[in-house]
């Protein structure tokens, strides 16, 4: 993994916060660049969404946390993120009317994180500037959720060296068994 991408993913303060937000262990489920193009009304992130594929499942505590690292300032002009407060507590998507009356736009300074429950309804705003607005998105989850990126395969294919503490943070210790026999053997050894 490129050190530029690893540094925000392994940020000590973020990891301390995640330990308080997600019960038990957590790992980096996915990481992706989010580029809000200039003068665009056709960008997919402009639609309100949740960041897990389980769109209508909610829990009494977070299953996953989104930590959006602002590479650039997120301003009103360049498409700072909108959130719908408390929408992570309802299985149903909010109505358009509810969104229009409840949404809050959150400007964020470059070099900081916007941290949200992955089930919080959110969207980028239109970027009305001449430059793209860039963020680095991280989804951290409890090990009971399948990773959206298989990190071990990413590293083996690219022959890259694991960063310090990578096994735990990338969830490599949470690999599911490949057979019933392996599952039963793991259970006996606990």
Where are these regions (language model features)?
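Short, well-ordered beta-to-alpha junction loops that form the rim of enzyme active sites
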Residues: 31-33, 86, 118-120
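Non-heme Fe(II)-dependent double-stranded beta-helix
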Residues: 1-48, 53-55
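Residues that flank catalytic or metal-binding motifs in active/ligand-binding sites
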Residues: 1, 29, 63-65, 77-79, ...
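A structural signal for short, well-ordered beta-strand segments
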Residues: 31-33, 67-69, 136-140
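Catalytic core of non-heme Fe(II) oxygenases with the double-stranded beta-helix
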Residues: 39-107, 145-152
